[in-house]
Amino acid sequence: MKIGFLYAGQGAHYVGMGKDFYDAYPVFKETFDNNSAEVDVKKICFEGPDEELNLTANTQPCMVAFAVGVTKVLAEMGIKPDMAAGLSLGEYSALYAAGVFTEEQVIPLVAFRGKAMVEAAEGRECKMIAVIGMEKDAVKEGCKKVAEEFDGTGLIAEPANFNCPGQITVSGDAQAVDRAAEVLKEMGAKRCLPVKVSGPFHTSLMKPAGDKLRERFASENFGDMQIPVVFNSLGKAKEDGESVAEILEKQVQSSVYFDDSIKYMVEQGVELFVEIGPGNTLSKFVQKTVDVPCIKVDKVEDLEKLKEAIN
């Protein structure tokens, strides 16, 4: 059976995530005790408070530490992916699973990424909304109308995540995003809901973060990819010769094509998805996109269900 690992992004995190794995599995505990991130991943993850964990510069290393730990637990059980993908931040966990990044490397790297993303948005009032019940092209068209209205102001609202059919996020400056919500509702969107993130991620406002990542990547070693990773900004695996560093630099400031990524993995023969991370957001996206099962691994008790699905 061909298995695809899917790694969660920001938004579903909660204080206490991973504590049951920490108590039950030494390989998971090792990740939380010995990582070299500048932030205290263990304390923030297990004790919070929410305000601390919700800060992007803290959320990112905590989420990736959780993902790395669970990946190691699954490997110990003999469960390894044939392909991997991740939503936004989750792409870094997917690259860890594929052998491109080491555990020692990836957690400090995403702490740097989180900080760079926060700094890119500093001084701007930003917002992200989830647009429910609207097609891709209509959302793009609505954002184009808003861009014309706000031309010359420097304010933007751009499609950020194409999560699954009927759910797309729009991100940017708060004023422009509020206007986009009005325009998209007038055009037939069922709802526009606020999303819990602290910056205009996956829009052109993140270019300064992309620039910082490019500089950081120059001093990073990228390992050989052991399994295919399906990239957010491509909606498919990379071609030979395409640089992972360039793709990741672009990823932070480009739309995420998660729906296309899921379809691509199924086309490549994936018969079971495993969602790694808090919550079950990606499982819902899979359910709405393809007819392939997805088992979430958020708590130790989820492992039984996964073993059953594989056997």
Regions found by a protein language model. Give the residues of each.
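Alpha/beta catalytic cores of group-transfer enzymes, especially the acyltransferase/condensing modules
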Residues: 11-12, 36-39, 98-253
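Short glycine-rich catalytic loops that host catalytic nucleophiles or stabilize transition states
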Residues: 195-197, 266, 298
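Short, charged, surface-exposed secondary-structure boundary motifs
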Residues: 302-310
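FabD-like malonyl-/acyl-CoA
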Residues: 1-144, 272-301
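A short, acidic, amphipathic alpha-helical segment used as a generic capping/interface helix at domain edges
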Residues: 254-270
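Non-catalytic positions within long, well-ordered alpha-helices that form the structural scaffold/packing
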Residues: 75, 185, 266-267
